[in-house]
Swiss-Prot record:
One of its GO terms (biological process) is lysine biosynthetic process via diaminopimelate. Pathway: Amino-acid biosynthesis; L-lysine biosynthesis via DAP pathway; DL-2,6-diaminopimelate from LL-2,6-diaminopimelate: step 1/1. The record marks H165, E217 as: Could be important to modulate the pK values of the two catalytic cysteine residues. This is Diaminopimelate epimerase. Substrate binds at N11, N78, G88, N89, N163, N199, E217, R218, G227, T228. It is found in: Cytoplasm. Homodimer. Its EC number is 5.1.1.7. It holds the Pfam family DAP_epimerase. Keywords: Amino-acid biosynthesis, Cytoplasm, Isomerase, Lysine biosynthesis.
Length: 289
């Protein structure tokens, strides 16, 4: 079984080309594949298929709103095997893989997801790297909330980027203090407000057009980056300074991206790197069930 490995600002993924969408991506198999000791290791799995094939194979009962059968479809699974609606870093790596593998010849096309269609632009391809912009859709503010991260309570802005986020700006926190925060520890949040869980971002206040951010992703834990999280962080940071639109550089442990928020849309631009291609042992995969 063929696979590829890639990352977007060190948010890493195993890509499984499966154009007929007939692989059994059970939670146990996905979790084993993402395990950094017994599997390949990753923050998530990206099945590479089309929307029509995914629907025909029963991956979903009906096409997500705005997605058509001919669109590419990113079937994304978290490291614990759960299904996720959207992954901004994953879309960049997914689009890069399509172009680099020859499955796609265009530099502009649409990637479907459970959160809907995500138009992409490959700005540059160079060796194993790419610079990709993703149209992420409108980021909707859903009020305020609070979460406990690393034993500290933070107030934040709830933001829907196709998946739920609580982005917490701490104006008193320095980048050094943020780096010392135990983001890997389990987070505590209002389950009534976020019944399906939530991704929690903690970030510094904007300075010179940039913020620093760390993230605890639902179903994964702390990751080096989270694409949708950087969009949510940009929305919260702009709101913190009294703005609804603008562009910010978001610095995460895995690198940096540029997020642009408009009245009707949001855009995520950043790198993708494809680091490996190979074959999974069929016997190992079959044993994961």
């Amino acid at each position: 079984m063929k696979f590829a490995k890639g990352h977007g600002t060190q948010n890493d993924f195993v890509l499984l080309p499966d154009l007929t969408a007939d692989l059994a991506l059970t939670p146990a198999a996905v979790a084993a594949l993402c395990d950094r000791r017994q599997g390949l290791g990753a923050d998530g799995v990206l099945r590479v298929t089309t929307a029509g094939a995914a629907r025909a194979a029963g991956v979903f009962d009906r096409l997500p709103e705005g997605v058509v059968e001919g669109d590419w479809y990113m079937d994304y699974r978290n490291a614990d095997g759960s299904i996720a609606q959207m992954c901004g870093n994953g879309v960049r790596v997914f689009a890069h893989y399509l172009r680099a593998s020859g499955l796609e010849s265009r530099d502009e096309f649409v990637v479907g997801s459970l959160a809907g269609p995500r138009p992409v632009v490959l700005n540059a391809l160079a060796g194993v790297g790419a610079d990709v912009t993703v149209e992420m859709g409108k980021a909707n503010q859903l009020g305020v909330g609070a979460a406990t991260v690393g034993g500290r309570q933070f107030n934040g802005l709830a933001v829907d980027v196709g998946n739920p986020h609580l982005a917490c700006v701490d104006a008193a926190m320095s980048s050094r203090e943020l780096a010392a925060l135990d983001v890997a520890a389990p987070v505590v949040f209002d389950a009534a407000q976020f019944p399906d869980g939530v991704n929690v971002e903690v970030l510094t206040a904007p300075e010179d057009g940039a913020v620093s951010m760390r993230v605890h992703e639902r179903g994964v834990g702390e990751t080096r980056s989270c694409g949708t999280g950087t969009v949510a962080a940009a929305v919260a940071a702009l709101a913190h300074q009294g703005s609804q639109t603008g562009s910010l550089t978001v610095r995460i442990p895995g690198g940096e991206v540029v997020v642009t928020i408009t009245d009707a849309n949001s855009y995520l631009r950043g790198p993708s790197v494809l680091v490996a291609h190979g074959d999974l042992a069929d016997e190992w995969w079959a044993a994961q069930g």
